[in-house]
A protein has these predicted regions:
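FIC/Doc superfamily catalytic core
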Residues: 1-336
C-alpha cells in the first residue's frame, strides 16, 4: 500500500508559505557576500547541533557546543554527551555530501545516517539496524518490528517519487512526522527524523547555502513540539495542524537568518571584500575542518607554496574572516 499523506492546504498554510518564499528570496538576493557565508553556516550548524541534541536531553550549552566543535575538551561533561554532539556534526557533513547526489535514497542510506548519528550513544538496540523490539511513545503504540521495513519502503518510495510535486517545506515536515510515527530504530529516532527533514531541504535546493536550522525553533518550546507530533494520530492521521506548526517554524527561522544577514551587512559596511577563488576554497576548507588547518596542511590543500599561501591568507586575516591560534611553531588557522 503506497504512502499518501493526508492534509489540507489551509489559508494559514498558504500565508506561511508565501512569507517563507518572500524571506527566502530576500536572503538570496541580499547581496550576501561569500565572506559572510562561512559565518552563517557555522552559526547554523552549531545552533542545530545544540538544539537537536538538547531536545533529547543533552546537557551541553550552545557555548559548549561551539567549543567542542572547535576542538576544546569538556571534562565536566560525560563522553556520551560530547559524542552525541560530535555525531550530529558528522551526520550533518554526510547529508551535505549525499544531498548533492541525484541517486534515489535507499534503506542503506538511512542505516548509514543512523550509524553516524546514534553510534555509541544508544540506550537499546543497534545503530544502523531497524529495531527488533516493540516501542511505545506515551500512549501511542508504534508499529510492530515486523512492519517497520515495509513502512520504510513505502516512505522511501514516496520520498523518491510523488514528494517532488510538493514544496520541500511541506515534504520535509511530512518526512519528519512519518519517520517518527514508524520509529524504525530502537533509539535515536528524534534526531534522525529531524536530520531527514534537513536532508530534504538540502537536496531540494531550499537551503542552498546551509545557513539555517529549524531545530532551534523546536527546541525553544519542546512541549509544543511534542504536542504537535502527538496530535496527528488523534486527528486520524491528518497532517494539516503539524504542517501549519512546522511552516511557522521555517518562517520564524528565516526571519532570524534575515536579521543575522542584516547584522553582518552592517558590520561589514558598504565596502565589499572581493575574494579570489583560492580564498573561497580556503574558507570552505576551514568550514569543513572545524579543528583548523596547520600551515603545511593548508599549503597542501591549496597546492601552493608558503609564499603563495601568504598572499591568500593576508587579506582574510586583515578582514578578520579567519584567525590564527597557537604558537608560531604549532599554530593553526580557523574561521574567525
Amino acid at each position: 500500500m503506497a504512502f499518501a499523506p493526508q492534509f489540507t492546504v489551509t489559508a494559514r498554510l498558504l500565508r506561511e508559505l508565501e512569507t517563507i518564499a518572500d524571506l527566502k528570496a530576500k536572503i538570496a538576493t541580499a547581496a550576501i557576500q561569500v565572506t559572510w557565508t562561512p559565518r552563517l553556516q557555522q552559526d547554523s550548524r552549531q545552533r542545530g547541533a545544540h538544539a537537536s541534541t538538547a531536545i533529547e536531553g543533552n546537557p551541553l550549552t550552545l557555548a559548549e557546543v561551539r567549543a567542542l566543535e572547535g576542538g576544546t575538551p569538556l571534562p565536566d561533561h560525560t563522553e556520551r554527551a560530547q559524542r552525541e554532539v560530535l555525531n550530529y556534526f558528522a551526520s550533518l557533513r554526510w547529508i551535505e555530501k549525499r544531498a548533492k547526489q541525484s541517486k534515489p535514497i535507499t534503506h542503506e542510506d538511512i542505516f548509514r545516517l543512523h550509524q553516524l548519528l546514534a553510534g555509541g550513544v544508544m540506550d537499546q538496540g543497534e545503530a544502523g539496524r531497524y529495531r527488533t523490539i516493540a516501542v511505545r511513545v506515551g500512549k501511542h503504540l508504534l508499529p510492530s518490528p515486523d512492519l517497520v521495513s515495509g513502512f520504510m519502503r513505502e516512505l522511501l518510495a514516496w520520498w523518491n517519487g510523488p514528494s517532488a510535486e510538493w514544496s520541500p517545506v511541506l515534504t520535509s515536515a511530512i518526512l519528519h512526522y512519518q519517520f517518527e510515527d514508524i520509529h524504525p530504530f530502537a533509539d535515536g529516532n528524534g534526531r534522525a527524523g529531524r536530520m531527514l527533514a534537513l536532508w530534504e531541504l538540502y537536496r531540494r535546493g531550499f537551503d542552498t547555502h546551509h545557513i539555517f536550522s529549524i531545530d532551534e525553533f523546536y527546541g525553544e518550546d519542546r512541549p509544543r513540539y511534542y504536542a504537535g507530533l502527538a496530535a496527528v494520530p488523534g486527528a486520524g492521521g491528518d497532517l494539516t495542524a503539524w504542517l501549519e506548526y512546522t511552516t511557522e517554524g521555517v518562517r520564524t527561522t528565516l526571519e532570524r537568518v534575515w536579521l543575522r544577514v542584516q547584522q553582518l551587512a552592517a558590520k561589514s559596511g558598504p565596502k565589499k571584500t572581493v575574494l579570489r577563488p583560492s580564498q573561497e576554497k580556503l574558507l570552505r576548507l576551514l568550514r569543513d575542518h572545524h579543528e583548523g588547518l596547520a600551515p603545511a596542511e593548508l599549503w597542501a590543500a591549496l597546492a601552493v607554496t608558503k609564499q603563495g599561501a601568504a598572499h591568500i591568507l593576508a587579506p582574510l586575516l586583515k578582514t578578520k574572516l579567519i584567525r590564527r591560534v597557537g604558537t608560531r611553531k604549532n599554530g593553526r588557522y580557523l574561521l574567525a
